[in-house]
């Protein structure tokens, strides 16, 4: 039996009545966003819109982005990444569970000093995936060049995020490279391992 999105009571400011809203709407009021699935265009558009709204509402307060994601679409992930860098608000990234592939990239994209993970989080980095079906050789060649260009761009960005050399990032991401929360901190992908909400910002 599938579990639906939980609802919680919420009282609008100035109202004496509570109404039931879904948990993600309620968390959004507190500037808490959640990436808890594979990264795709739909979730990217939703997160981009929410970050832009929260930033325009009050860019002096941080936005909290909780991540428990196996990764997903590179182009969708880059839309989220660019928005994290675009908004004036600090973006606190918090790994709960797994941040793999594009999930790990977004974890590292948070505001420096405000990228954290819970103690039993797992982080995995690797090169972007690309596949071809039955297509013309010239199309396959074009796609391969684009994948290599994206790989190079992601590795340079990861190098900037972590302080690791481009060559080390290139070597480590050649295959799946798993890190514990503490290892991710030592690697420079996050800044702290936390066990209490007060440690997040």
Curated annotation (Swiss-Prot):
Pfam families: CLP_protease. One of its GO terms (cellular component) is endopeptidase Clp complex. It is found in: Cytoplasm. One of its GO terms (biological process) is protein quality control for misfolded or incompletely synthesized proteins. It catalyses: Hydrolysis of proteins to small peptides in the presence of ATP and magnesium. alpha-casein is the usual test substrate. In the absence of ATP, only oligopeptides shorter than five residues are hydrolyzed (such as succinyl-Leu-Tyr-|-NHMec, and Leu-Tyr-Leu-|-Tyr-Trp, in which cleavage of the -Tyr-|-Leu- and -Tyr-|-Trp bonds also occurs). It is an enzyme of class 3 (hydrolase). GO terms for molecular function: ATP-dependent peptidase activity; ATPase binding; serine-type endopeptidase activity. Its EC number is 3.4.21.92. Fourteen ClpP subunits assemble into 2 heptameric rings which stack back to back to give a disk-like structure with a central cavity, resembling the structure of eukaryotic proteasomes. Belongs to the peptidase S14 family. Cleaves peptides in various proteins in a process that requires ATP hydrolysis. Has a chymotrypsin-like activity. Plays a major role in the degradation of misfolded proteins. This is ATP-dependent Clp protease proteolytic subunit 2.
């Amino acid at each position: 039996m599938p579990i639906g999105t939980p609802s919680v009571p919420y009282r609008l400011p100035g109202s004496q009545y509570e109404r039931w809203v879904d948990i993600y709407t309620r968390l959004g009021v507190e500037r808490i966003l959640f990436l808890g699935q594979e990264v795709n265009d739909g979730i990217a558009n939703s997160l981009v819109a929410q970050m832009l709204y929260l930033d325009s509402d009050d860019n002096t307060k941080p936005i909290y982005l909780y991540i428990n994601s196996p990764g997903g679409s590179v182009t969708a992930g880059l839309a989220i990444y660019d928005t994290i860098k675009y908004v004036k608000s600090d973006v606190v990234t918090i790994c709960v569970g797994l941040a793999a592939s594009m999930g790990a990239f977004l974890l590292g994209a948070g505001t420096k000093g405000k990228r954290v993970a819970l103690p039993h989080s797992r982080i995995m980095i690797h090169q972007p995936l690309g596949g071809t079906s039955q297509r013309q050789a010239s199309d396959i060649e074009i796609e391969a060049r684009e994948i290599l260009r994206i790989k190079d761009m992601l590795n340079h960005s990861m190098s900037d995020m972590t302080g690791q050399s481009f060559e080390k990032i290139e070597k480590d991401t050649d295959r799946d490279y798993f890190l514990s929360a503490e290892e991710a901190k030592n690697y420079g992908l996050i800044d702290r391992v936390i066990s209490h909400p007060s440690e997040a910002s």
